[in-house]
């Protein structure tokens, strides 16, 4: 690889996800000021030279995003199915170029779809309505969680949103231990992308999906439930509400879904047997 190209790639992967722009405040429309705004760029996931999906995302931690997306969409079963990965600039955004095993690439080609996604959209561009809600193996019941430990985690979720603290424009997804401690998290302008980044990182580091839960700062859509279940997550906590389809998918795949998570409050939609209070 040429030095100039390598330097360009390093610059791309070291982006902070924040850009300063000129803007005006309501109380002073005569004088512009600089403020931080979250970056949102098109990110294409390219498998073995073929573009599979374009998502709008924050330009950070894209390797984790690509790995998490590949796992949560059933493209791969393990990080070992990916032989290599590079993040490179393209004409209008970024590409994550992924080298899949031959077996996985053949499977991908059989069900290939092209998405032109809105921000973190998990449905845009599916070829048929039947493609929505892929079958998920029912989850086992291997753990419990004390809801009294949730409040402390909620207080620290913002720690994983440095861009969000500057801009007010990102979602977070974090892993919560049974003690309530958050031991890793990611943020993104797209809630699904933030979750994929978390799933990708934990898989890359070989962490177990047992003994813990996912906590997200957003609502719980069916895609969030499905992605979590595809990776073996048994419990999903969301700060906002759940949709009807999210509840249906969670019920079907044995995932414990909890919404409206605030200090002293939580609404359990499915499988409360994993929870105590």
Swiss-Prot record:
Active site (catalytic residues): 121 (cysteine persulfide intermediate)
Molecular functions (GO terms): molybdopterin cofactor binding; protein homodimerization activity; sulfur carrier activity; sulfurtransferase activity
Record's note on what induces expression: Repressed by aerobiosis.
Keywords for this protein: Cytoplasm, Molybdenum cofactor biosynthesis
Positions of Mo-bis(molybdopterin guanine dinucleotide) binding: 260-265
Subcellular location: Cytoplasm
Stated consequence of mutating residue 171 to A: Does not affect overall structural integrity, but cannot promote FDH activity
GO CC, one annotated term: cytosol
Residues annotated as transmembrane: none
Single GO biological process annotation from the record: Mo-molybdopterin cofactor biosynthetic process
Annotated Pfam families: FdhD-NarQ
Family: Belongs to the FdhD family.
Biological role stated in the UniProt entry: Required for formate dehydrogenase (FDH) activity. Acts as a sulfur carrier protein that transfers sulfur from IscS to the molybdenum cofactor prior to its insertion into FDH. Specifically interacts with IscS and stimulates its cysteine desulfurase activity. Also binds the molybdenum cofactor. Required for activity of formate dehydrogenase N (FDH-N), formate dehydrogenase O (FDH-O) and formate dehydrogenase H (FDH-H).
Oligomeric form and interacting partners: Homodimer. Interacts with IscS.
HAMAP family: FdhD
Protein name according to UniProt: Sulfur carrier protein FdhD
Organism of derivation: Escherichia coli (strain K12)
């Amino acid at each position: 690889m040429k030095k100039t190209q390598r330097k360009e790639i390093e610059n791309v992967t070291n982006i902070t996800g924040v850009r300063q722009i000129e803007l005006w405040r309501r109380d002073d429309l005569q004088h512009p000021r600089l403020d931080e705004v979250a970056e949102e760029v098109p990110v294409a996931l390219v498998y073995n030279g073929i573009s599979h999906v374009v998502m709008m995302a924050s330009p950070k931690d894209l390797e984790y995003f690509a790995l998490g997306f590949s796992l949560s969409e059933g493209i791969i079963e393990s990080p070992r199915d990916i032989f290599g990965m590079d993040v490179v600039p393209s004409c209008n955004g970024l590409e994550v170029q992924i080298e899949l095993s031959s077996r996985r690439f053949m499977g991908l080609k059989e069900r290939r779809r092209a998405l032109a996604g809105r921000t973190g959209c998990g449905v845009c561009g599916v070829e048929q309505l039947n493609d929505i809600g892929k079958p998920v193996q029912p989850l086992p019941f291997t753990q419990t969680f004390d809801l009294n430990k949730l409040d402390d985690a909620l207080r620290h979720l913002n720690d994983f949103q440095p861009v969000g603290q500057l801009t007010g424009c990102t979602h977070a997804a974090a892993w919560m231990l049974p003690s309530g401690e958050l031991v890793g998290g990611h943020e993104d302008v797209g809630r699904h992308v933030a979750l994929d980044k978390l799933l990708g990182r934990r898989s890359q580091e070989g962490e177990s999906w047992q003994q813990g839960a996912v906590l997200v700062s957003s609502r719980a859509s069916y895609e969030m439930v499905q992605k979590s279940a595809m990776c073996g997550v048994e419990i999903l906590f969301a700060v906002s509400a759940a949709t009807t389809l999210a509840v249906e998918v969670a019920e079907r795949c044995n995932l414990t879904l909890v919404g409206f998570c605030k200090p002293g409050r939580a609404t359990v939609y499915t499988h409360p047997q994993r929870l105590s209070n």
